[in-house]
């Protein structure tokens, strides 16, 4: 399903109008001419509304709408026409919807998609079309060994949050032997690969790697395979972390559990029970970040949708800030795609819900990543559970602590790389 949205209502084709307000950016190399654009700025979103990834996909749309409502439906001094497309969470559907956004709806920018396998499916197409795309999808190689010049990522690669998590698990939690579990697709492979590489670098060992399918109704058979270890790393996405943590607790295991950006997402806190207490995760966004930009974002989500935001909403809101800053830098001009991409890459923001960010030369974000522990202390907004930040890793790049060329000399993280070694 594809829909165009304005002021919370749905119609076939509507313009979003209002006054401008946007994010600050350091873009001195792009002097901004006077903005005089009669045409609307067409913003397209590829997201997921059905299936196990739908919870995050719905929050993606809410994050965009929260920003548009805050700015009175203006970006870069131009009225916005916003089209939201449901990919169905599969590669074929994603490509079809991308083609519709580009060829039928004539969008100026695509936000999304959600899943790494979706982004891999459309990478060649967006390159051919020279379509500026700000993707939440964390497909590592598209800002590494196979960089796409029309892709910008303001969220994280799949492995980017898991690398500091691996370091923290080894050096501060003092874990030695871990079993990893994540979905049997690209995001899962790349998450667990990043965790394994960093964990092993700091003296840890991976005992086993388990790969349940994305649509696994019951994780009990996989929990039963955990075996001899002193910790577990889960990288499930969407609503799957809820089922896994319940199965884990029901089995009576007491080993510490660590996770990445999706397994401890703030939006899951209202659905988690006692089984999640003590879960330690690493994320590029955290609800407890006490800065004005984050409070403004949270208040907007509560006002507009009466929901607690997580990283899916927050990072799409940040993507809108990036687009707004770049469009202001070009004076509202986005017809020249290469010029607009150059402006996007040059964005350097300090006032975002996730904290400061900038981009590396391969178009991936450099920003803060937060280690959080779920507990009851400090809970707000009617929640019983809360993510409390216990450590901040600043200016984290996709290459972690490795020199870029050394990192890129290795294969992309996969189901089999890094390989298991004897513990």
Spans of model-derived segments:
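Extracellular/periplasmic ligand-binding modules, especially the Venus flytrap/periplasmic-binding
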Residues: 194, 238, 243, 289-347
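Extracellular/periplasmic Venus flytrap/periplasmic-binding protein
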Residues: 96, 140-142, 149-251, 287-296
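C-terminal segment of N-terminal export signals and the immediately downstream linker at the start
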Residues: 30-48
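Extracytoplasmic "Venus flytrap"
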Residues: 44-67, 85-91, 114-115, 181-189, ...
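Periplasmic-binding protein-like
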Residues: 101, 105-114, 134-136, 179-182, ...
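Solvent-exposed, acidic/polar segments of extracytosolic/periplasmic ligand-binding ectodomains
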Residues: 348, 352-423
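N-terminal secretory signal peptides
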Residues: 1-10, 17-29, 35
């Amino acid at each position: 399903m594809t829909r165009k949205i304005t002021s919370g209502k749905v119609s076939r084709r509507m313009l979003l109008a209002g006054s401008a307000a946007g994010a600050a950016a350091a873009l001195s190399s792009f002097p901004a001419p006077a903005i005089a654009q009669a045409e609307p700025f067409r913003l397209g979103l590829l997201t997921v509304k059905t299936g196990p990834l739908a919870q995050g996909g719905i929050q993606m749309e809410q994050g965009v709408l929260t920003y548009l409502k805050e700015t009175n439906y203006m970006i870069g001094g131009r009225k916005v026409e916003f089209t939201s497309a449901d990919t169905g969470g599969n590669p074929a559907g994603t490509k079809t919807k991308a083609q519709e956004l580009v060829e039928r709806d004539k969008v100026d920018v695509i936000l999304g998609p959600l899943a790494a396998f979706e982004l891999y499916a459309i990478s060649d197409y967006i390159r051919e079309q020279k379509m500026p795309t700000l993707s939440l999808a964390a497909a590592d190689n598209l800002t590494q060994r196979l960089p796409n010049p029309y892709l910008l990522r303001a969220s994280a690669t799949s492995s980017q949050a898991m690398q500091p998590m691996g370091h923290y698990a080894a050096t501060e939690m003092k874990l030695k032997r871990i079993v990893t579990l994540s979905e049997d697709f690209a995001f899962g492979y790349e998450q667990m690969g990043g965790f394994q590489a960093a964990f092993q670098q700091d003296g840890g060992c991976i005992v086993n790697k388990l790969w349940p399918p994305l649509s696994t109704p019951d994780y009990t058979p996989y929990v039963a395979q955990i075996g001899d270890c002193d910790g577990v790393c889960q990288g499930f996405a969407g609503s799957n972390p809820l089922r896994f943590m319940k199965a884990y607790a029901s089995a009576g295991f007491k080993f510490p559990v660590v996770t990445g950006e999706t397994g401890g997402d703030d939006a899951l806190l209202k659905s988690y029970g006692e089984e999640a207490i003590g879960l330690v995760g690493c994320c590029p966004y955290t609800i407890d970040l006490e800065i004005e930009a984050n409070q403004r974002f949270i208040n907007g989500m509560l006002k507009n949708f009466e929901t607690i935001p997580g990283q899916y909403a927050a990072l799409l809101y940040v993507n809108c800030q990036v687009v707004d800053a770049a469009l202001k830098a070009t004076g509202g001009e986005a017809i020249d795609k290469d010029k607009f991409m150059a402006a996007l890459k040059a964005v350097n923001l300090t006032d975002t819900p996730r904290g400061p960010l900038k981009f590396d030369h391969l178009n991936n974000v450099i920003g803060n990543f937060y280690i959080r522990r779920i507990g009851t202390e400090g809970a707000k907004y009617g929640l019983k559970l809360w993510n409390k930040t216990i450590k901040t890793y600043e200016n984290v790049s996709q290459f972690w602590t490795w020199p870029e060329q050394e990192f890129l000399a290795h294969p992309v993280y996969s189901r089999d790389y890094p390989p298991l070694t004897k513990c």
